Amino acid sequence: MAISYNGLWKLLIDNGMNKGDLCKKTGISSSTMAKMTNGESVKLSVLERICEELDCDFADLVEYVKK
């Protein structure tokens, strides 16, 4: 199973933010951000905090990619 966070990266660009900004605003740890950068799964609670900050839905952030 592979997870793509390309939607999240696009939203960050569209909002003029970088990964560090998102970590500060949501309280996400750098290790969790590294997991997302590497396409690894993270807890739903992390995605919920991101959705709250960026005013979006889960589907805007992640995509399941078949290998």
Where are the language model's segments positioned?
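A short, Lys/Arg-rich alpha-helix, primarily the initiator
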Residues: M1-G20
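The alpha-helix within a helix-turn-helix
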Residues: L12, C23, C51
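Short, basic-rich loop-to-helix N-cap that marks the start of a DNA-contacting helix
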Residues: G39-E52
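Key DNA-contact positions within bacterial/archaeal DNA-binding proteins
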Residues: G20, S31, A59
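Short C-terminal boundary/hinge segments that cap the last helix of small helical domains
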Residues: D55-K67
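Recognition helix of helix-turn-helix/homeodomain-like DNA-binding domains
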Residues: I28-S41
